């Protein structure tokens, strides 16, 4: 579709004149006795999709629809227009002889972007297009802005994210992404509910930021006169519920991390966390691959997806490999043979990786993996047995206590899930928190704080438990072939635009 406003976006003077004309039309309509915002309710009989999907049953019938004018073509005493509702566009035909002189003059004044309600008979035009022959119409809302033309005005991603309302109007494929997002979230809930999980809600305001290695947002509670934190994870409250005997719980909600932004990170994002008593990280692996396959089948009708041109097969079982073996496979270094922290640091330096003073062997292993291995994990892969130094809430492996019963799942070189056999030894947990406190005192703002109440909960007794976290936005990215996380969040965080 090409509109008369194609080239105005580079001409401020012309744009301002068109905006002035729209406001002038507002006054003209009011002088004609039309209040452009005066209708509070408009009853529709159908949506555009009803008619377009079942034309044979609607042909010749009178219907009432409402939508936004997206194009308008006048031919003397007859005009065609396309109106867009929730489900798409449909053509309308407005004729002078049918609606009368005054109404036709009003229709001629209307602009692209105005919202109208129409009543008329369904028929097909000479070109075979399904059309409404309008017998009556009402202006429901006058648009005072100029809608950008699809390929010119809204190709700037920054503008699209800032004005998502306009993006949704102009680009139907954007609306499809968010409709699919809703289906994905519904499918996740359905999958977990069917397996006996209980959905719960836990606090967003925390007195202690815990459950993840991340920098929190800080706020102040005036009545209590204390600083509080927007949650960076859901973990510690959900584990308290496992202690309380709920056994299978999950929460899907917003978490907030005061960190950088890129194509995979937004400061506020949707996180799914679930915990199940009497299972371990192997049980979480099975649940993870089943959940991804279920959602793909439910939403896309197939367990294979194409992401950025690469076919990804989500069908279980997924590949499983330890972190140390993955490094050995892709880098050629066997950290099982490395005995000291110093030796590990030297290996990292030879690999041209930047190290920090005092790094432990486990931290070096994680560094090598992050920098040199992740990008190779295209097909779904569980990377298992993470070093204890970077896994303060995961249970140690009994046969190798330097590592934990933890995995992360990777697709297309990106982490999509994180899971543990949860640490339920309160003494070990307290020791790890104390080690994290040392890291905080040394300047690591992402290290865990001490949470005495959580330690107390573990002392009451938590059964063996498997826990899983999935970034819902990243899952949606894969299911919708979205390049950036901003493409799957309706209103992503943006730097304020300077006036």
UniProtKB/Swiss-Prot annotation:
It catalyses: tRNA(Lys) + L-lysine + ATP = L-lysyl-tRNA(Lys) + AMP + diphosphate. It is found in: Cytoplasm. It is an enzyme of class 6 (ligase). InterPro entries: Aa-tRNA-synt_II, aa-tRNA-synth_II, aa-tRNA-synth_II/BPL/LPL, Lys-tRNA-ligase_II, Lys-tRNA-ligase_II_bac/euk, Lys-tRNA-ligase_II_N, Lys-tRNA-synth_II_C, NA-bd_OB-fold. One of its GO terms (cellular component) is cytosol. Mg(2+) 1 binds at residues 408, 415. It comes from the Bacteria. Homodimer. This is Lysine--tRNA ligase. The lineage of its organism: Bacteria, Bacillati, Bacillota, Clostridia, Thermoanaerobacterales. The gene is lysS.
């Amino acid at each position: 579709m090409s509109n008369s406003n194609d080239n105005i976006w580079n001409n401020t003077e012309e744009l301002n004149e068109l905006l002035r004309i729209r406001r002038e039309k507002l006054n003209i309509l009011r002088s004609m006795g039309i209040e452009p915002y005066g209708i509070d309710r408009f009853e529709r009989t159908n949506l555009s999709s009803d008619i377009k999907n079942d034309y044979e049953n609607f042909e010749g019938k009178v219907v009432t629809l409402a939508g936004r004018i997206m194009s308008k073509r006048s031919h003397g005493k007859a005009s065609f227009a396309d109106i867009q509702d929730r489900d798409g566009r449909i053509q309308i035909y407005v004729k002078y002889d049918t609606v009368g002189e005054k109404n036709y003059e009003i229709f001629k004044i209307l602009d692209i972007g105005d919202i109208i309600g129409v009543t008329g008979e369904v028929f097909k035009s000479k070109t075979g297009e399904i059309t409404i022959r309008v017998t009556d119409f009402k202006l429901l809302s006058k648009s005072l802005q100029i809608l950008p033309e699809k390929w010119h005005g809204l190709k700037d991603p920054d503008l699209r994210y800032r004005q998502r309302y306009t993006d949704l109007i102009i680009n139907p494929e954007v609306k499809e992404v968010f409709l699919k997002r809703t289906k994905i979230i519904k499918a996740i809930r359905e999958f977990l509910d069917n397996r006996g999980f209980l959905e719960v809600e836990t606090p967003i305001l925390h007195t202690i930021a815990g459950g993840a290695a991340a920098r929190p947002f800080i706020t102040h509670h005036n009545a209590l006169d204390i600083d509080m934190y927007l949650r960076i994870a859901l973990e510690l409250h959900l584990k308290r519920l496992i202690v309380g005997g709920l056994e299978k719980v999950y929460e899907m909600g917003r978490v907030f991390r005061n960190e950088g932004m890129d194509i995979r990170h937004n400061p506020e994002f949707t996180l799914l966390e679930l915990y199940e008593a009497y299972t371990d990280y192997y049980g979480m692996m099975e649940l993870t691959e089943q959940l991804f396959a279920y959602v793909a089948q439910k939403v896309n009708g197939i367990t294979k997806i194409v992401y950025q041109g690469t076919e990804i097969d989500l069908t279980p079982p997924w590949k499983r490999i330890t972190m140390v073996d993955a490094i050995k496979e892709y880098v050629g270094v066997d950290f099982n043979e490395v005995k000291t922290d110093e030796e590990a640091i030297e290996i990292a330096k030879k690999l041209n990786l930047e190290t920090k003073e005092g790094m432990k062997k486990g931290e070096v292993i994680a560094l090598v993996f992050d920098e040199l291995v992740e990008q190779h994990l295209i097909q779904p892969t569980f990377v298992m047995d993470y070093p204890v130094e970077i896994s303060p809430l995961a249970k140690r492996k009994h046969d190798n206590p330097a590592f934990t019963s933890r995995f992360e799942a990777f697709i297309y070189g990106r982490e999509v899930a994180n899971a543990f056999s949860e640490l339920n030894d309160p003494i070990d947990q307290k020791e790890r928190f104390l080690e994290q406190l040392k890291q905080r005192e040394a300047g690591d703002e992402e290290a865990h704080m001490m949470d005495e109440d959580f330690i107390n909960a573990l002392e009451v007794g938590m059964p063996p438990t498997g826990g899983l976290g999935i970034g819902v936005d990243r899952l949606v990215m894969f299911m919708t072939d979205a390049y950036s996380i901003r493409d799957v969040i309706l209103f992503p965080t943006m730097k304020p635009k300077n006036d």
